[in-house]
Amino acid sequence: GGEEQFDDYGHMRF
């Protein structure tokens, strides 16, 4: 998505 977020497993997504 662009912003740093954490998925339901706690992994960083960008």
Swiss-Prot record:
<dbReference type="GO" id="GO:0005576">
    <property type="term" value="C:extracellular region"/>
</dbReference>
<protein>
    <recommendedName>
        <fullName>Sulfakinin</fullName>
    </recommendedName>
</protein>
<dbReference type="InterPro" id="IPR013152">
    <property type="entry name" value="Gastrin/cholecystokinin_CS"/>
</dbReference>
<dbReference type="Pfam" id="PF08257">
    <property type="entry name" value="Sulfakinin"/>
</dbReference>
<dbReference type="InterPro" id="IPR013259">
    <property type="entry name" value="Sulfakinin"/>
</dbReference>
<feature type="modified residue" description="Phenylalanine amide">
    <location>
        <position position="14"/>
    </location>
</feature>
<dbReference type="GO" id="GO:0007218">
    <property type="term" value="P:neuropeptide signaling pathway"/>
</dbReference>
<keyword id="KW-0527">Neuropeptide</keyword>
<comment type="similarity">
    <text>Belongs to the gastrin/cholecystokinin family.</text>
</comment>
<comment type="function">
    <text>Myotropic peptide.</text>
</comment>
<keyword id="KW-0964">Secreted</keyword>
<keyword id="KW-0027">Amidation</keyword>
